[in-house]
Amino acid sequence: YTGVRDYMNNIKAQAKEDKFVETIMGRRLYLNEINAANGLRRQAAERAAINAPLQGSAADIIKKAMLDIDQLLLNEMQDVKMIMQVHDELVFECPKSKADAVMEKMKDTMEKTVELNIPLIAEAAIGSNWNEAH
């Protein structure tokens, strides 16, 4: 994919100039080895330059969603509990009678947690346990 190659080249060039990369919410990863003479160290820093904005931004988004949902739970849904986070997934516990409404509210909240140039789509499922929800 040309766009992916362009992204990789542009982010490496920017990192070589700035000596850091940023996530969507401005967290920085400093890359002290990005211009290293040692090829292995330089290549490791280049890989980090490419991966950190993507993986770090995903982490930013899920953490922001957790904060938004925490406020929602405190203010509107005290009988719903956020149980755990697994990578980009959140697991909740709620009364069975409210499961559909809770699922839709969580999905909507997660999709609106950050404004991007493209839609942010969240998937949701209901189950009696984590395995059933997959």
Tell where the protein language model's regions lie, with residue ranges:
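Conserved catalytic core of nucleotide polymerization and phosphodiester-bond processing enzymes
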Residues: 1-134
